[in-house]
Amino acid sequence: MQNENPKRVWLYARIPGNDVETLRCIRECAAKAQQDNCNIVGTSTDERPGWLLRPGYREMMRQVKAGKIDCIHIYRMRQISGKEQHLFRFFQQVMQHGVKVVTLEYSLRDRLHEYRLGMKIENYAARHKLP
């Protein structure tokens, strides 16, 4: 049975200093979204390293908070952040709004355990009765 309302997906990529690779990641995320019969409602990229100067990330999170997306496709978690506290805050925010995260390069569950976030996120979800 086909889902009448395809998932609304946002694509995000960030590889500082490498526009070609960033665009390749966006293309692969778009292909995955199309394969999953999702509706791509937005795309953003960031060019800079660090956490503060990331307008693409901020726009994506505005859309999350506004309830405009159901899923975020990213190529790898490091494109969000390599820091545990930033990743935890990211997952808190998307979970509060029921947004699913899909990574293409590897298993998200395995990667969260590598970042020591698996149990933290599961505990947070249980405390707040989130899926």
Model-assigned labels for residue ranges:
Residues 1-131:
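Short, structured surface patches at the beginning of a domain
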